Design a protein with these regions (language model features):
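Short, solvent-exposed secondary-structure capping/transition elements
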Residues: 82-83, 96-103, 123-125
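Catalytic Zn2+-binding segment of zinc metalloproteases
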Residues: 90-106, 110
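Acidic-and-aromatic substrate-binding clefts and catalytic sites of carbohydrate-active enzymes
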Residues: 76, 80, 102, 111
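Generic structural signal of hydrophobic/aromatic residues within well-ordered alpha-helices
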Residues: 29-33, 46, 121
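N-terminal low-structure segments adjacent to metalloprotease catalytic domains
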Residues: 1-31, 56, 60-62, 99-100
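Post-HExxH zinc-binding segment in Zn-dependent metallohydrolases
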Residues: 104-127
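Active-site scaffold of zinc-dependent metalloenzymes
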Residues: 36-80, 93, 97
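Short alpha-helical catalytic segment bearing the HExxH-like zincin motif
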Residues: 81-89
Length: 127
Protein backbone atom coordinates (compact mmCIF):
# COMPACT_ATOMS: atom_id res chain seq x y z
CA UNK A 1 0.00 0.00 0.00
CA UNK A 2 1.09 3.54 -0.75
CA UNK A 3 -0.20 6.54 1.18
CA UNK A 4 -0.28 10.12 0.02
CA UNK A 5 -1.55 13.39 1.49
CA UNK A 6 -3.04 16.06 -0.78
CA UNK A 7 -3.90 19.48 0.62
CA UNK A 8 -6.23 21.76 -1.32
CA UNK A 9 -5.39 25.18 0.09
CA UNK A 10 -8.15 26.99 -1.76
CA UNK A 11 -10.72 24.90 0.11
CA UNK A 12 -8.78 24.13 3.29
CA UNK A 13 -9.39 20.45 2.50
CA UNK A 14 -7.08 17.49 3.11
CA UNK A 15 -7.32 14.26 1.13
CA UNK A 16 -5.54 11.16 2.38
CA UNK A 17 -5.11 8.65 -0.46
CA UNK A 18 -4.41 4.98 0.21
CA UNK A 19 -3.47 3.19 -3.03
CA UNK A 20 -2.96 -0.44 -3.98
CA UNK A 21 -4.80 -1.47 -0.81
CA UNK A 22 -4.94 -5.17 0.00
CA UNK A 23 -6.62 -7.24 2.74
CA UNK A 24 -3.62 -6.93 5.06
CA UNK A 25 -4.21 -3.14 5.06
CA UNK A 26 -7.79 -3.42 6.38
CA UNK A 27 -6.93 -2.45 9.97
CA UNK A 28 -5.04 0.65 8.83
CA UNK A 29 -7.92 1.69 6.56
CA UNK A 30 -10.35 1.18 9.43
CA UNK A 31 -8.20 3.33 11.73
CA UNK A 32 -7.99 6.16 9.17
CA UNK A 33 -11.74 6.11 8.63
CA UNK A 34 -12.47 5.96 12.35
CA UNK A 35 -10.13 8.92 12.95
CA UNK A 36 -12.16 10.86 10.38
CA UNK A 37 -15.40 10.14 12.24
CA UNK A 38 -16.68 7.19 10.23
CA UNK A 39 -18.55 4.69 12.40
CA UNK A 40 -21.28 2.07 12.42
CA UNK A 41 -22.41 0.38 9.24
CA UNK A 42 -20.35 2.56 6.84
CA UNK A 43 -17.18 1.67 8.78
CA UNK A 44 -18.07 -2.03 8.89
CA UNK A 45 -18.86 -2.04 5.16
CA UNK A 46 -15.55 -0.34 4.33
CA UNK A 47 -13.60 -2.80 6.48
CA UNK A 48 -15.37 -5.75 4.85
CA UNK A 49 -14.76 -4.40 1.35
CA UNK A 50 -11.02 -4.14 1.95
CA UNK A 51 -10.88 -7.50 3.73
CA UNK A 52 -12.56 -9.23 0.76
CA UNK A 53 -9.55 -8.32 -1.35
CA UNK A 54 -11.36 -8.28 -4.67
CA UNK A 55 -9.70 -6.25 -7.44
CA UNK A 56 -10.93 -2.94 -8.81
CA UNK A 57 -12.63 -1.70 -5.64
CA UNK A 58 -12.48 1.65 -3.92
CA UNK A 59 -14.22 3.86 -1.43
CA UNK A 60 -14.28 7.47 -0.32
CA UNK A 61 -15.35 8.92 3.00
CA UNK A 62 -15.43 12.63 3.75
CA UNK A 63 -16.06 14.55 6.93
CA UNK A 64 -17.44 17.79 5.54
CA UNK A 65 -17.32 19.43 8.98
CA UNK A 66 -13.54 19.04 9.20
CA UNK A 67 -12.75 19.32 5.48
CA UNK A 68 -11.04 15.95 5.25
CA UNK A 69 -11.45 12.92 3.01
CA UNK A 70 -10.01 9.43 2.89
CA UNK A 71 -9.78 7.78 -0.52
CA UNK A 72 -9.07 4.05 -0.63
CA UNK A 73 -8.17 2.42 -3.93
CA UNK A 74 -7.68 -1.32 -3.95
CA UNK A 75 -5.39 -3.26 -6.19
CA UNK A 76 -6.42 -3.40 -9.84
CA UNK A 77 -6.03 -5.91 -12.63
CA UNK A 78 -4.27 -3.32 -14.82
CA UNK A 79 -3.19 0.34 -14.84
CA UNK A 80 -6.18 1.42 -16.95
CA UNK A 81 -8.64 -0.01 -14.43
CA UNK A 82 -6.65 1.56 -11.60
CA UNK A 83 -7.01 4.97 -13.30
CA UNK A 84 -10.73 4.38 -13.64
CA UNK A 85 -11.03 3.67 -9.90
CA UNK A 86 -8.87 6.67 -9.01
CA UNK A 87 -10.96 9.05 -11.11
CA UNK A 88 -14.20 7.55 -9.79
CA UNK A 89 -13.20 8.01 -6.16
CA UNK A 90 -11.77 11.49 -6.72
CA UNK A 91 -15.06 12.54 -8.28
CA UNK A 92 -16.69 11.71 -4.94
CA UNK A 93 -14.21 14.04 -3.24
CA UNK A 94 -15.09 16.77 -5.75
CA UNK A 95 -18.79 16.20 -5.03
CA UNK A 96 -18.25 16.54 -1.29
CA UNK A 97 -16.18 19.71 -1.66
CA UNK A 98 -18.65 21.13 -4.16
CA UNK A 99 -21.52 20.56 -1.77
CA UNK A 100 -19.77 22.51 1.00
CA UNK A 101 -18.47 25.34 -1.18
CA UNK A 102 -21.42 25.45 -3.60
CA UNK A 103 -19.23 24.68 -6.61
CA UNK A 104 -21.27 24.10 -9.76
CA UNK A 105 -20.67 20.47 -10.74
CA UNK A 106 -21.35 21.42 -14.38
CA UNK A 107 -18.76 24.19 -14.41
CA UNK A 108 -15.04 24.47 -14.99
CA UNK A 109 -14.10 24.79 -11.31
CA UNK A 110 -15.28 21.24 -10.57
CA UNK A 111 -13.46 19.94 -13.64
CA UNK A 112 -10.20 21.65 -12.68
CA UNK A 113 -10.57 20.38 -9.12
CA UNK A 114 -10.94 16.80 -10.36
CA UNK A 115 -8.01 17.19 -12.75
CA UNK A 116 -5.81 18.62 -10.00
CA UNK A 117 -6.61 15.77 -7.63
CA UNK A 118 -5.89 13.11 -10.23
CA UNK A 119 -2.70 14.90 -11.35
CA UNK A 120 -1.51 15.01 -7.73
CA UNK A 121 -1.57 11.22 -7.77
CA UNK A 122 0.51 10.90 -10.95
CA UNK A 123 3.70 9.64 -9.28
CA UNK A 124 1.75 6.99 -7.40
CA UNK A 125 -0.14 5.94 -10.54
CA UNK A 126 3.04 5.82 -12.62
CA UNK A 127 4.41 3.16 -10.27
Amino acid sequence: MTEQEIYLGRYGWAVHVMSDVRPEDAAMVERRLRDLGCSGVPLEDAYSLVLEGKPNKGLTYSNVDTGKSVVVIGWAVCDAVYMNSLCHEMLHVVQHISEVFMVNMYGEEACYLLGGLVQSCYKVVKR
